[in-house]
Regions:
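Bacterial Sec-dependent N-terminal signal peptides
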Residues: 1-22
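Terminal presequence/propeptide segments associated with secretion/organelle targeting
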Residues: 17-713
Length: 713
């Protein structure tokens, strides 16, 4: 059978790495990846790849950390200072804030080590080495007859390999991750540091300038950075928080460039991108759009409206709910943009054309046809069989598991290990009780009632958990009356009640509480729904793995990078602007001039409110060594580096491995980037390190911190 040439060209563009700036590359095989090495040098890289990652010698990657497991960061001083985004440190800043000490609004500046603030929930993770363990993992699954048996075997050996690392050295953590839809497996060895203290945070008028309005948008003028410090024991090893700990002495300190960049300058990011679905089938993309994305859009929109109303009315609620609102709205807007971009950029049409080309290739190769003859029909049928239930599960998760905090408390209680070591029980109880500090019961009640209504409106009645029957029979269908009664009778609506409740001994007492009983009903329904589609889900898991492998065989000469999975990756490209639509061109950087323009344009909008003293400082033009060649102050810049969620706080380096800034966002026109790379549109937005240092030194009067930094000469 002859290939359809035009379709095959689309396949090449859609599913293979043909763009120099596309890809989130594994560090472990950088030296073997001659094609990537060549392209980086052609774009301007001026350092050998073994200076980027080298498990045997200090290298650039040793300065890069996973920040809390949800962001990235970079070590910039011999005393363990870490730069990350303001929105990455936002939760920590919020937890230390109060109406009297509003660090969110005013910023926080530690003048000495003694003033630096501990964050018990926070850690940083250093990557020490990676190792390909594919043969060992697949060998353990060679006798598996079903997808379930394969998964159990694979998960077991992955866990064993990881445990072997910590058994040899208790300060290390070994994690095996799957790549290429489960066709390859790599071990990553990490060392975690759990004493991480807040050192510097600019006011939100800098770190969150533009807030939701500007989120995912270019041009941008947000100084999205914060500064933390890693602490270690006296032997420079990991340690829990202690006043006796000392600043960590790093293996490698990232040098900082004050020379800036120009159009076409080489730029690379190192960080921990969360997840992408670049090789997902069109059936999976369609499910994502109509399932989890639409559920986030609908449910979070309702929940956030309840929160925002009270946040705008009360300063204490603004502080309490700032972090959770920020996290929720970030992915809410992301889902809106993703669905819009999928349609606008015709992503589904491109994927379907690519799949048609793969079908032709399979048909033209007898050995492939024998193995994969039913691949696409099986995928299509399996996705169809779980479509309705999977969509309901997405709404279920958003409405209940990520919805009212009373339910989240109850679910934690059900998972509470009362038989654990006493010290662990006390620690976990303390953490659970602390969550009440950021809860307002009247708001949570309103959220719960809204979630119950939204879920009922969006799914078939067969997906309603048992509490809806109770609402109908005992409360005449009055959801608000049910919620009022629930919150009035549950013991776990206050820290005191929860503590008293947790100190009881028997499981019988646990389920007596109406909120815990309700959560049990939710678990039962959630399990029932998942079980009903388990067979289809297994078929999809297998089908997507075979699809991925077939695609790589079809283009065996191409350089395929694996999807992001929260492991360290390198991305590279160049600094440059773009054309978002006909008649418009965006430059590759912004300056403080744009701050004044936006303040004027959005007069009265708190998203763009800036302290008069900061405006005065910026208008003075006294930028010193941080000014660009024209004497102005750059704020943000863009490159075509390939990033996603989790890359927030990633170091953006120049060709010499010197820090230019921190990645913090993507752009609205390419919000489908987790699914397909759009070379003409996709941009990584970064905050310029010179603006960061200017704010630290001139506004925050933190010259002592700037003195710690390694400025490249």
């Amino acid at each position: 059978m002859k290939f359809r040439l035009t379709v095959l060209i689309v396949f090449s563009l859609c599913l293979s790495n043909v763009f120099a700036d596309e890809g989130m590359w594994l560090l472990g095989n950088l030296r073997k990846n001659k094609q990537t090495d060549r392209v980086m040098k052609e774009l301007g890289l001026q350092m050998p790849v073994n200076k980027i990652y080298n498990p045997k010698k200090p290298s650039l990657s040793d300065a890069v950390v996973s920040f809390g497991g949800f962001c990235s960061g970079v070590v910039v001083s011999e005393d363990g200072l870490v730069f990350t985004n303001h929105h990455c440190g936002f939760s920590s800043i919020q937890q230390h804030s109060s109406v009297e000490h509003d660090y969110l609004k005013d910023g926080f500046f530690a003048r000495s080590l003694d003033e630096e603030l501990p964050n018990p929930e926070l850690y940083v993770r250093f990557l020490l080495r990676t190792e390909d363990v594919t043969k060992r993992v697949l060998s353990a699954a060679r006798y598996a007859k079903t997808e379930t048996e394969r998964r159990v075997a694979v998960d077991s050996i992955m866990n064993v390999i990881g445990l072997e690392v910590s058994e040899k050295d208790s300060t290390l953590t070994g994690i095996v991750d799957a790549y290429y839809a489960g066709n390859e497996f790599w071990l990553s060895v990490y060392r975690d540091y759990n004493d991480v203290r807040l050192v510097f945070a600019p006011p939100s008028s800098v770190g969150k300038f533009g807030w939701d309005t500007d989120n995912w948008v270019w041009p941008r003028h947000t100084g999205d950075f914060s500064v933390f410090r890693i602490y270690a024991n006296t032997k420079n090893g990991p340690a829990d928080y202690s006043p006796d700990n000392v600043p960590y002495r790093p293996e490698y300190v990232a040098p900082i460039s004050l020379d800036g960049y120009k159009e076409g300058s080489f730029c690379m990011t190192l960080g921990y991108p969360g997840s992408t679905e670049r090789y997902l089938s069109s059936y999976g993309i369609e499910e994502m759009m109509n399932g989890i994305n639409q559920a986030m859009i609908d449910v979070r929109g309702v929940k956030q409206a309840v929160w925002k109303l009270e946040m705008d009315r009360r300063p204490d609620i603004r502080i309490k709910y700032a972090s959770k609102y920020d996290e929720s709205s970030n992915y809410w807007k992301n889902s809106i943009g993703t669905n819009k971009a999928i349609k606008h950029l015709k992503v589904l049409e491109k994927k379907r054309a690519a799949e048609a080309a793969l079908r032709d290739w399979i048909q033209s190769h007898p050995e492939e046809r024998e193995k994969l003859i039913r691949l696409f029909s099986s995928l299509e049928l399996s996705y169809s069989n779980r479509r309705e239930t999977n969509r309901a599960l997405a709404y279920f998760g958003e409405s209940f598991i990520n919805g009212p905090e009373l339910v989240q408390f109850a679910l934690e209680i059900l998972n509470f290990d009362f038989e654990a070591e006493e010290k662990l029980v006390i620690t976990r109880m303390k953490k659970l009780l602390e969550k009440y500090d950021n809860l307002d019961l009247s708001i949570d009640k309103e959220v719960f009632a809204a979630m119950l209504k939204e879920y009922q409106l969006k799914v078939d009645k067969k997906y309603l958990p048992a509490m809806y029957e109770k609402i109908d029979t005992l409360y005449n269908g009055n959801i608000q009356a049910y919620v009022d009664s629930l919150y009035a009778t549950s013991n776990i609506t206050s820290p005191k009640g929860l503590k008293r409740f947790l100190e009881r001994d028997t499981t019988y007492n646990l389920i007596e509480d109406p909120a815990v009983s309700l959560s049990l009903d939710l678990i039962v329904k959630y399990y029932e729904m998942n079980q009903s589609i388990s067979e289809a889900s297994e078929q999809i898991e297998q089908g997507e793995r075979l699809f991925n492998a077939a695609m790589r065989r079809m283009y065996a000469d191409r350089n395929f990078y694996p999807d992001a999975n929260s492991t360290m990756r390198l991305s590279f490209g160049t600094v440059g602007g773009y054309t978002p639509f006909d008649g418009a061109t965006y430059d590759y950087y912004t300056t403080v001039k744009g701050i004044f323009e936006k303040v004027k344009e959005h007069a009265g909008d708190i998203d763009f409110a800036v302290q008069p003293e900061l405006l005065s400082l910026l208008s003075s033009g006294d930028f010193g060594r941080y000014a660009n060649a024209q004497g102005d102050m750059n704020v943000c810049f863009i490159s075509n580096n390939d990033i996603t969620g989790g890359n927030s706080g990633s170091a953006m380096f120049n060709a010499k491995g010197e820090l230019l800034g921190l990645a913090f966002d993507g752009n609205w026109e390419a919000m489908s980037s987790d699914i397909v790379f759009e070379p003409d549109l996709q941009r990584c937005i970064g905050v310029d390190v010179r603006y960061m240092l200017f704010i630290m030194e001139k506004y925050g009067k933190a010259g002592n911190l700037v003195q710690e930094l390694k400025i490249a000469r």
